[in-house]
């Protein structure tokens, strides 16, 4: 039987960050997820030929260091880089005419 230092239920952003930080300190971690893909609500799905992003689309303060964004702090600690796309202003899409 395998032994783990920590067992995490759920592979949302919180579970993945917690597991990553524990693993970084040398802990043996097991993460359980009920769905077919990790990420919790931060994922995408296809329906009727369209792709929908159901997770957050704006990560305020994640691209500059130092940051107060908790995810940005964890990514820095783990030395992980993410590709960022800067917003070029705020746009509102109205679907009332449909």
For the regions a protein language model found, what residue spans apply to each?
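Anionic group-transfer/hydrolysis microenvironments
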Residues: 7, 35, 55
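Glycine-rich FAD pyrophosphate-binding loop
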Residues: 24-46
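Short acidic-hydrophobic surface loop/beta-edge motif
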Residues: 43-47, 91-94
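N-terminal FAD cofactor-binding segment of flavoenzymes
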Residues: 52-88
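Conserved small/polar residues in nucleotide/adenosyl-binding loops
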Residues: 96-98
